[in-house]
Structure formats: structure tokens, C-alpha cells
Amino acid sequence: MTTTQDKNSQAAITPDRALQLLEEGNRRFMAGRREERELMAQVDATRGGQWPFAIILGCIDSRVPSELIFDAGIGDLFNARVAGNFVNGDILGSMEFACELAGAKLVVVLGHTHCGAIKGACDGVKLGNLTGMLARLEPAVEATNSPQEAAARTSANGPFVREVTVRNVRMALSDIRERSEILETLERSGAIRIVGALYDVETGSVEFLD
């Protein structure tokens, strides 16, 4: 959308429409038909406040910039980013602010293919503060049952890494619902949707998960 979000336009967007806007934006991105925007005009329009329609929890990977892959403008999206797109108390608090206080209608946990953090967790990497961070991703590795051979459960196995990535997204969705009464209540009432997605760094496409 080329117009800048305001309070009224945000209020008119349903959770389903918010998801549709992201899907449409990704299709434009893939087709090379991004909408033209006067970014400085959007800066001016958002001086007094912001009314994003979604919050994206994504990885820090430089290949996955939410505003670009969803063809969104300034003021459209909240972004929370951490390597491996896992959920912790700070992320939950940010999501609660975005939805309960700032009116966002959609929560997206966005994983991506060839994720370095997921690969590190698959390989059991130990390095400084990275060790504790990757420990947050190990449950997704452990919950991925196939293959069972240890030699095949490494970053060298592309299908295994992809399955762990999807599993990690789904576990993050469960964490959100289980650990945030505010977000769970908003979703149950129909005020928001909470969905998972996977971005393909080779094609530019976003697959929303069931």
C-alpha cells in the first residue's frame, strides 16, 4: 500500500486483511513490481505517531529485511529480530505492546531457509554468548525425529535443517500462545492472528505455514 497507515486505516484492517497485505506485498517483491513510495513523505506523515498493521518476529539475517520482502512502507510493520527468531520475555513484551497498545492485527514468526543460527544449533556450536542463544533453538533440533543417524543430523543435511527451521517457527508460535495471556486472549477473540512463515532466500518467496 502506498498510503501511510493512520489510526483509521489501521482500525479498518482485519487480521485476515493484514495477512493478505503481506501476501500481496511479497508477490510484488518477487515480480519486481514494488510500489513507488515517497519515503520522506511517510517520515513526515508518521511524525506524530505510528499505526502498523503487523509485527514480524524475524532473524537478524541480512537477506531477510521485512519491509522489502513484503513491499511495505514506513509505519506499516513492527519488527523484532533475533538470530533464530525465537521467543523470550522481551520479544513477548514487544508483541504485547504492538498488539494490545498499538493496534497491530497480525503476529508473524518468520523463519528462513539456510539460517545460520539453525545450522549452528544443528551442529552444537559453542562460542561465547552464542552458546546460550543457540540453546534456545536446541528444542527444535531435538523435536525433529528424522533422520535418527547422528551423522545426518548436521547442517550438511539441507532437508534436516529446513525441517528444524519449520519446527522452530511452530514452537515459537506455541510459546507465544502459552506464555502470553494477552496475545492468546486477543487471538481467541479474533482481534489478531498469530501465524508462522518461511522465507526462501533463494527465490524471495514467503510461504505461510498452516
Stretches with model-predicted labels:
Residues 57-94:
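Active-site cofactor/substrate anionic-group-binding motifs, chiefly glycine-
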Residues 61-63, 113-117:
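Gly/Ser/Thr-rich loops at beta-strand to alpha-helix junctions
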